[in-house]
């Protein structure tokens, strides 16, 4: 297992190097001049040129790149032009908000999609099977920002059941003492159940938006994988041996159907990292997605580069976790590693 993990980490290094190079080049190719934005609309050409020199943008591209990689090697992502704060600090402060939203959306999606896919596979052609197909089609068809706007319109504007979509907490509540950065967990640790209730109420709509978006591929893959396994010889043998239907489905069929589902979960999580950007803008969520969008609009290179690199590292770590889960579920993966 350790050998397999070491190999995966070695294979990830070229990918991260490629991400650093491509991100650097793409940010420099974006339209707009950070020096002009930072100087303001009334600045003269001399003032803009002076700021450009101060930011190092007058240097050759290769020199800028080596300076950037040297800073990265020391853990320095640079400073944001719009906030004046270190990018690493901004990302560290905002990442828990994005993580809490993404993880809750994924957990809700898994809790609905996997049982729905299993029921659809064990009852093909029934109403639950048709419900699964309709749900997956709707989840794939609806853009994530449209789903979010519809939920806000229905549950906040029309029905008044949801609080205003303006961040992680209601204005009348203060953040719990920071332990993990996740408000739900920190509020429980502090035994502040009012803050927990407020944080959960703010999370429901954006998490539901992500859950609807991610539910479709998980349910569809669960259904397809279960159908394939249920038609296999060892399942027919288990049924012929007189085992109960629940034992056959859960112990034999579902465990063997899990590998494709786990692969889908890794892809869905990566999709959610991208969809998070739109959801955070719709719900004014103070995560790294909205931070990256604001930096992109203002041609602020450092936050965009820091955001992309953070997402790449998270994706590499996610794939490593998936590989470890493969080894836990299927011993053949450990032997091949």
Summary of predicted features, one role per range:
Residues 3, 7, 40, 50-53, ...:
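Short amphipathic alpha-helical coupling elements at transmembrane boundaries
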Residues 15-66, 155-195:
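Hydrophobic alpha-helical transmembrane segments of membrane transport/permease proteins
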Residues 19, 23-27, 148, 152, ...:
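Juxtamembrane/transmembrane-helix interface segments of polytopic membrane transporters
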Residues 58-114:
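An internal, D/E-rich "acidic patch" concept
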């Amino acid at each position: 297992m350790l050998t397999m993990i070491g190999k995966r980490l070695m294979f990830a290094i070229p990918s991260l190097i490629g991400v650093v190079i491509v991100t650097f080049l793409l940010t420099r190719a974006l339209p707009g001049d950070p020096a002009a934005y930072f100087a303001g609309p009334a600045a003269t050409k001399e003032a803009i040129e002076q700021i450009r020199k101060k930011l190092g943008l007058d240097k050759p591209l290769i020199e800028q790149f080596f300076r950037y990689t040297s800073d990265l090697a020391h853990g320095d992502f640079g400073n944001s032009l719009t906030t004046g704060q270190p990018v690493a600090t901004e990302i560290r402060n905002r990442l828990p908000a994005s993580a809490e939203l993404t993880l809750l959306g994924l957990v809700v999606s898994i809790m609905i999609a996997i049982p729905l896919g299993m029921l659809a596979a064990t009852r093909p052609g029934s109403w639950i099977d048709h419900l699964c197909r309709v749900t997956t089609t709707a989840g794939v068809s609806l853009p994530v920002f449209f789903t979010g706007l519809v939920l806000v319109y229905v549950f906040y504007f029309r029905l008044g059941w949801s609080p205003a979509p303006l961040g992680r907490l209601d204005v009348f509540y203060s953040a719990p003492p920071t332990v993990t950065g996740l408000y739900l967990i920190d509020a429980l640790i502090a035994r502040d159940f009012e803050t927990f209730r407020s944080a959960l109420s703010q999370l429901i709509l954006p998490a539901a938006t992500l859950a609807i978006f991610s539910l479709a591929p998980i349910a569809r893959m669960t259904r397809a994988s279960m159908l394939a396994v249920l038609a296999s010889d060892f399942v027919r043998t288990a049924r012929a041996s007189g085992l109960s239907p629940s034992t056959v489905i859960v112990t034999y069929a579902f465990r063997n159907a899990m590998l494709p589902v786990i692969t889908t979960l890794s892809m869905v999580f990566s999709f959610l990292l991208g969809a998070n950007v739109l959801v955070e803008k719709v719900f004014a969520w103070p995560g790294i997605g909205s931070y990256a969008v604001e930096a992109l609009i203002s041609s602020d290179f450092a936050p965009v580069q820091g955001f992309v690199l953070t997402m790449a590292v998270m994706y590499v770590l996610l794939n490593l976790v998936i590989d470890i889960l493969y080894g836990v579920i299927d011993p053949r993966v450990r032997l091949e590693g």
